């Protein structure tokens, strides 16, 4: 699945959108697009979790795939109310902005849980990116938003080069992060800090980090504000 990134970027086109689906296998694919490669969707808005046209993504496996350039190799959202039991394994990434990207909308109740990522090699701007995403924000007058959550996320057995290893922003007003495990990782990065306070019960074991000097992706996308302005590092 191909859509050009340069010298002239193609239209915003995800390779695969998984929208309120269950029991999906993505295997032996090559993806290089000017947007997200695999995006988990399923609705947005202040009452999206109760709208009958929306739904969860459950029991999704991505394996034995290779990525060229993309904005996110595996992206949760931003239009996503619930994704659970997601496995990504045996993946090679040649380049891109974000490897694992969890977009969290301040105008949508969201839950991302039971995620396993393992046996990954490659390079991108951000290894793990969890930040607010407010593109096309519209609370529609609702003021009593439940707290969104990301729970039970495991990343293990990866060798990765990146600009930022742990691009994770705490925002307890809108979402709560809990029960993350980072195991057996070999990371080379410019920004090597890991904010342990951003995640409740963050377990880190056998993570080896080597600091590098050069930023390779100065134009990478981290988040987007309510004015639809792209924000990098």
Give a label for each model feature.
Residues 1-233:
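Extracellular/periplasmic carbohydrate-active domains that bind, remodel
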């Amino acid at each position: 699945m191909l859509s050009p990134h340069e010298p002239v970027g193609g239209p915003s086109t995800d390779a695969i959108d998984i929208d309120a689906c269950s029991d999906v296998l993505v295997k032996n694919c090559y993806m290089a697009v000017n947007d997200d490669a695999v995006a988990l969707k399923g609705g947005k808005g202040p009452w999206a979790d109760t709208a009958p046209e929306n739904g969860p993504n459950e029991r999704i496996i991505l394996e034995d795939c290779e990525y060229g350039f993309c904005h996110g190799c595996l992206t949760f959202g931003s239009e996503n109310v619930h994704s659970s039991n997601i496995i990504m394994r045996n993946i090679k990434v040649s380049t891109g902005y974000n490897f694992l990207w969890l977009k969290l909308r301040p105008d949508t109740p969201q839950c991302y849980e039971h995620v396993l990522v393992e046996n990954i090699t490659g390079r991108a701007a951000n290894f793990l990116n969890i930040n607010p995403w407010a593109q096309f924000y519209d609370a529609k007058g609702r003021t009593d938003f439940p707290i969104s959550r990301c729970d039970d996320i495991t990343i293990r057995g990866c060798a990765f080069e990146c600009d930022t290893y742990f691009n994770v922003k705490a925002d307890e007003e809108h979402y709560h992060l809990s029960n993350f495990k980072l195991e057996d990782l070999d990371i080379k990065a410019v920004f090597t800090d890991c904010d342990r306070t951003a995640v409740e019960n963050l377990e880190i074991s056998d993570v080896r980090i080597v600091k590098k000097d050069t930023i390779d992706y100065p134009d990478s996308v981290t988040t987007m504000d309510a004015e639809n302005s792209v924000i990098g590092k």
